[in-house]
Amino acid sequence: MTKQTHAIEHKVISNWINTGTSVLDLGCGDGELLSLLIRNKLVRAQGVELNEQAIHNCVAAGLSVFQQDIDTGLTEYADKSVEYVILNQTLQQVKKPDFAIKEALRVGKKVIVGFPNFCYFTDRFQIFFRGRVPVTPSLPYEWYDTPNLHFLSIADFKEYCKKNQITIENEAFISKNRAVRVFPNLLGEVGLFLLSK
């Protein structure tokens, strides 16, 4: 994913979050989004991350982050104890995405999910014409070194929400550093969703 797409993604997420609220970022990486939300939205933020180097980077930046595998659950958090739980560029990398979403919805009043759309048209072309697993800016890994375990599309995720009575309060789709308004499952490189239950 390009830095510009990443920045647009963070802007969309920031716009969905109310000022002064509590945020839990699951799979927060180096804390770039957490830092942005603290600075621009004055949120009370905490991150969860598995990667030790990313945790050290977060702590060095003054962020509150602890190490945990979100596949094991969020037992430290009471129901609806956080206003926003974020799963951005994380869902496709966890072993149990259904469990992660349900735990996020249990803990958070609202949940923000963002992921690469594995049915983006350039991915489809690479599979169809080259007969190979796609390598693109949003999916920059070879098949043998990808952290992605689950390959979902925007349509798959919407169907999942419908089946599980999860309300999609807002959605945004990004491609080539701009918003996508039509045929998001084909033209959207990244899907973002604001959820509640």
What are the functions of these language-model segments?
Residues 36-73:
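Class I SAM-dependent methyltransferase SAM/SAH-binding core
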Residues 31-35:
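Glycine-rich SAM-binding Motif I of class I
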Residues 4-20:
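Conserved alpha-helix/loop element of class I SAM-dependent methyltransferases that forms part
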